From Swiss-Prot:
HAMAP family, alphabetized: Ribosomal_uL29 (MF_00374)
Family affiliation: Belongs to the universal ribosomal protein uL29 family.
InterPro entries reported for this sequence: Ribosomal_protein_uL29, Ribosomal_uL29, Ribosomal_uL29_CS, Ribosomal_uL29_sf
Protein name (record): Large ribosomal subunit protein uL29
GO cellular component terms listed in the entry, alphabetical order: cytosolic large ribosomal subunit
Length: 65
């Protein structure tokens, strides 16, 4: 997900997306631990998406203050 797409979301939608990505990251880590993970690049993509969302949320919080 690109930063442009994330910025178009509302704060509630961003929080929901972050929650979804965290759940996916949790599942991917389990798959990696058991040797079932085929697409290891997905781990870093999900982590980066979480970071993008957190960054944009903090930018919005600073804007409002």
């Amino acid at each position: 997900m690109k930063a442009k797409d994330i910025r178009a979301l509302t704060t509630d939608q961003m929080l929901e997306k972050e929650k979804q990505y965290k759940e996916e990251l949790f599942n991917l880590r389990f798959q990696q631990a058991t040797g079932q993970l085929e697409n290891t690049a997905r781990l870093s993509k999900v982590r980066k998406n979480i970071a993008r969302i957190k960054t944009i949320l903090s930018e919005k919080a600073l804007e409002n203050n």
